[in-house]
């Protein structure tokens, strides 16, 4: 395919147009008075959302240079969402402000590499200031307030705080759709481990990139599964039972994996293959934990069991299994409660007898997985569109609350970023590096200004006023009052604020140092073929 190339200012401006198109659509959602965006879907009802990363994913631009610019900003939103579960809109607004100021200086003759170094040093300083000023989240009320801001709903915030209180800060919280209205919290036996599906072809929900199995059989194998003839007798029995199958093994490869994938694609048989968690003896122990939790047995040569002779009686079961690319969650395993309690007691005894800090830490992890359980938040709504949007908000709020517990919280509403700007005075920079730091200083006010604008206030006036307020005091956009934001419950996890700034600066530096863009040449649509038979004389076709 032939390519087109743009250089210098033309290249950078093309990328900036794409960034602006995406950022302008996303930034209207920022803050408590932010608006919604409607996303058209090829199939089904449109989605209404105020989640930055969901909006960014949907934007596809026609111009090849603009398309690349938009894709780079999508990466900012996605990366921030992956790390912290929130802050995608803030990251996009910061990226837009950094690029706008940066390109203005590049056009005026500044050295892009000098600006890049200045931006990096300034971001490092602001990050350090944010982490120093962060307050630890200790109470249930603080967790509820942080989650409520992310979800835009106090009821959701309180429910998440309750869930974290019950399963612990590292515990598993999943969100499911409910047939009833409102929200419910259920605690179930369950486990999550950090291994995902071996092949993307196992995905059952393409939009969320998840494989969901309802009431599956669970096969646990301590060795590799590579030949299909070993697996076939058992597969036939599972297919006859009409249930899906989760395979957890050291690895699933070769023709065994191909057979599972082909049958999944054809719709003959639903299965998911996952690598077993851990290594060596720890892997064996974790497989045994899963076996006890699900009421199954580990197929292993050590205990005289092989795949060829394995029967359905050796398989575990669970109410539901959800597998993503990175992790597997087993909900309500069918294991015997006495056996689970016995296993928990055994692990506790091992923890007490262990001399190694590392071993003790790993045993604690196993104990938390086995005894902690899974909190399931069931969300209901009047329509499918509302239900999807609500479920997404709750999932983001859960990640947000966990981020708050991890690194602490700072004043929300863009105030922490703006009030960390004076720390840049401590940097002794000169020339283009000083200009780069100044670009960051200007950009730090962008989120607050956008929140004020979305709330119908004058951005410049609000930013000026907040600059002169004591640390942590600022605009509560929900009420229009200037107050101590942490006391008022307007807080952001510092992990969210920090990630948003770091990711935005990373992409802005790439924009400024770009000297050429190579893009695919847009193909002209082929002219429709004429009628080979020709028309009838005198007739108008």
UniProtKB/Swiss-Prot annotation:
The protein's name: Chaperonin GroEL 2
EC number(s) given by UniProt: 5.6.1.7
Highest taxon of the lineage: Bacteria
UniProt binding sites for ATP: 29-32, 86-90, 413, 476-478, 492
Subcellular location: Secreted, Capsule; Cell surface; Secreted, Cell wall
UniProt keyword Secreted present: yes
GO molecular function: ATP binding; ATP-dependent protein folding chaperone; isomerase activity; unfolded protein binding
HAMAP family: CH60
Record's function text: Together with its co-chaperonin GroES, plays an essential role in assisting protein folding. The GroEL-GroES system forms a nano-cage that allows encapsulation of the non-native substrate proteins and provides a physical environment optimized to promote and accelerate protein folding.
């Amino acid at each position: 395919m032939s390519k087109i190339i743009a250089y210098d200012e033309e290249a950078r401006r093309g990328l900036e147009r794409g960034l602006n198109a995406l950022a302008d659509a996303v930034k209207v959602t920022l803050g408590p008075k932010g608006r919604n965006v409607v996303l058209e879907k090829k199939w089904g009802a449109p989605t209404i959302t105020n989640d930055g990363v969901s909006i960014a994913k949907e934007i596809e631009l026609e111009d090849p240079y603009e398309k690349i610019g938009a894709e780079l900003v999508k990466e900012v939103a996605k990366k921030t969402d992956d790390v912290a579960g929130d802050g995608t809109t803030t990251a996009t607004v910061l990226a837009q402000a950094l690029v706008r100021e940066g390109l203005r200086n590049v056009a005026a003759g500044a050295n892009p590499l000098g600006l890049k170094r200045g931006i990096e040093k300034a971001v490092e300083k602001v990050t350090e200031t944010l982490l120093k000023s962060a307050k630890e989240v200790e109470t249930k009320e603080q967790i509820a307030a942080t989650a409520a801001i992310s979800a835009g709903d106090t009821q959701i915030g309180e429910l998440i705080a309750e869930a974290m209180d019950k399963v612990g800060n590292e515990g598993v919280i999943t969100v499911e759709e409910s047939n009833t209205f409102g929200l419910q919290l259920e605690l179930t036996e369950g486990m999550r481990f950090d291994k995902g599906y071996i092949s993307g072809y196992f995905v059952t929900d393409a939009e969320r990139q998840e494989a969901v199995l309802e009431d599956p059989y669970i096969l646990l194998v301590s060795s590799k599964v590579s030949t299909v003839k070993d697996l076939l007798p058992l597969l036939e029995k599972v297919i006859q039972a009409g249930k899906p199958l989760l395979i957890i093994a050291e690895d699933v490869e070769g023709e065994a994996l191909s057979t599972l994938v082909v049958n999944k694609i054809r719709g003959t048989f639903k299965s998911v293959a996952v690598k077993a968690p851990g290594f060596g003896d720890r892997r064996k122990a974790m497989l045994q934990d899963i076996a006890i939790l699900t009421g199954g047995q580990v197929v292993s040569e050590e205990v005289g069991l092989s795949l060829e002779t394995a029967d359905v009686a050796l398989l575990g079961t669970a109410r539901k299994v959800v597998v993503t690319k990175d992790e597997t969650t087993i909900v309500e395993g069918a294991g015997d409660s006495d056996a689970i309690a016995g296993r928990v007691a055994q692990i506790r005894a091992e923890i007490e007898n262990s001399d190694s800090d590392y071993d003790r830490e790993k045993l604690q992890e196993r104990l938390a997985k086995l005894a902690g359980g899974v909190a399931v938040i069931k969300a209901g709504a009047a329509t499918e569109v509302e239900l999807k949007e609500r479920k997404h908000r709750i999932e983001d709020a859960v990640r947000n609350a966990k981020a708050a517990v991890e690194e602490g919280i700072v004043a929300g509403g863009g105030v922490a970023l703006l009030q960390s700007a004076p720390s840049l005075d401590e940097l002794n920079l000169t020339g283009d590096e000083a200009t780069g730091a100044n670009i960051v200083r200007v950009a730090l006010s962008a989120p607050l200004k956008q929140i004020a604008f979305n709330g119908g206030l004058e951005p410049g006036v609000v930013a000026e006023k907040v600059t002169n307020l004591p640390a942590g005091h600022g605009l509560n956009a929900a009420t229009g009052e200037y107050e101590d934001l942490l006391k008022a419950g307007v807080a952001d996890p510092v992990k969210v604020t920090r990630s948003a700034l770091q990711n935005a600066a990373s992409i802005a530096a790439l924009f400024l140092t770009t000297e050429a863009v190579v893009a695919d040449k847009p193909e002209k649509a082929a002219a429709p073929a004429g009628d080979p038979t020709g028309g009838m004389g005198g007739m108008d076709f």
